[in-house]
């Protein structure tokens, strides 16, 4: 009988630590719901003690997600753990993930604690967490650089206190597959009560080996949980890619002999959603979810695939959620047909007000382009989801004037705290003029660090999706806007980013696990 491999998704916690990938509470809820449809086992929804925003996001996710275990990170102290437990209280099933550094460098320089003090604090933290749940994960931060004897002593102690999952992270992405697997195997063999816990891996991709390291630990060292993110999202070079480890284990079941509960048909929808919300574009040749993952340009390959797909395809595109663009609705389609298509796409809107707003935007788009695709509907919902009661800026309209040999001029009308504003500006091009027009009324002082345009579907009528990344006072935020008019999409994206900058969120604690 095969073992179960647990998929622990940390897109909303570790993935969000990518510069510019910060998400609003509503965006996190949308991703959490998609992760639930994906049937991941555990969703690490955030770090409750790091900010009030994280606390509220975790609590909201715990209220709406019912089929996945919801997890919060917590430092090894009573205050953090109690805060995590409070945020997780509404969940059907929840886990507390606590951690403390165990390397000599971290203990001396960061914690300013002796090894004995760290050992006692780790044990007491797990003991305290047991008051709230039996599902407790422990991570020794910088464990791969810790003294082996001390690391084993700490892990044996926390298992004795009731830790049910032990996670050994490759914090800085330095490990290689054989060495990482050997570390975990050695630790498990040296700890007499290692069989009382599930062993987990959490790898970073600095050397491009996060997936290989994770799979080596599973195959060679008995790890039975992989911590990963959608699209490999994460700071620096990212984390272990969920789609890659899942499809490796699924496709090579003959080698791994493990069961996995993920609904793989939801992988591509999850990838697209995370990319759209964060603005981190998926590279075309990315395994599983890249646009070219199932494309064959070679004539020999094309001929082989046409005759028998398994000649060059080791998995089917539809098995991971890829499908051809499909015309689903048009300008004559009614509200019920629109709601039905939302359900078929797995999109859940919380209220009739949200449905009405999305339907209104759909009808506006249908007047502009004849054919409405699934990707258009997803973009509509994503765009509407950015609007909330606390929204500071909102796009209303745009007019432009541009003639060859003259500097373009733009006039942008938008609301600021409910009051209509009108700004005018000139620039080197229509987009530059439009953003100058907005800044003429806002004076944000932000620096643009990224501007990118992507066509949502094919054809000249396609909606443009614009991503804008702004930096100010050490904060980096991301905004996305969609519209058949690229310049209007740019204005929407810029205002969306300004909304995030306007949110006076306190500085979050971002642990390196």
Swiss-Prot record:
Its main location: cytoplasm. Keywords: Amino-acid biosynthesis, Branched-chain amino acid biosynthesis, Cytoplasm, Leucine biosynthesis, Manganese, Metal-binding, Transferase. Pathway: Amino-acid biosynthesis; L-leucine biosynthesis; L-leucine from 3-methyl-2-oxobutanoate: step 1/4. One of its GO terms (molecular function) is manganese ion binding. Belongs to the alpha-IPM synthase/homocitrate synthase family. LeuA type 1 subfamily. Its EC number is 2.3.3.13. This is 2-isopropylmalate synthase. It comes from Cupriavidus necator (strain ATCC 17699 / DSM 428 / KCTC 22496 / NCIMB 10442 / H16 / Stanier 337). GO terms for biological process: L-leucine biosynthetic process. It is found in: Cytoplasm. The keyword Transport does not apply. The gene is leuA. NCBIfam families: leuA_bact (TIGR00973), PRK00915.1-3 (NF002086), PRK00915.1-4 (NF002087). Catalyzes the condensation of the acetyl group of acetyl-CoA with 3-methyl-2-oxobutanoate (2-ketoisovalerate) to form 3-carboxy-3-hydroxy-4-methylpentanoate (2-isopropylmalate).
